[in-house]
Amino acid sequence: MAVQQNKKSRSARDMRRSHDALEPNALSVEKSTGEVHLRHHVSPDGFYRGRKVIDKGADE
């Protein structure tokens, strides 16, 4: 089991944790429909980069 040699100071601990913060997800607005979706993902209505890529009627 790993055991530290010396105690880490509060400053060293906090500096290490400075990169751990979560960032909000990057969102995009679909050009053709104005729908908001995650970057590099198909929008809920089946459009991606202005083109219809999924036909929702065929699934149902």
Swiss-Prot record:
Residues 1-60 are annotated as: Disordered. The keyword Ribonucleoprotein applies. GO terms for molecular function: structural constituent of ribosome. Residues 11-22 have a biased composition (Basic and acidic residues). It comes from the Bacteria. InterPro entries: Ribosomal_bL32, Ribosomal_bL32_bact, Ribosomal_zn-bd. Pfam families: Ribosomal_L32p. Belongs to the bacterial ribosomal protein bL32 family. This is Large ribosomal subunit protein bL32. The lineage of its organism: Bacteria, Pseudomonadati, Pseudomonadota, Gammaproteobacteria, Pseudomonadales.
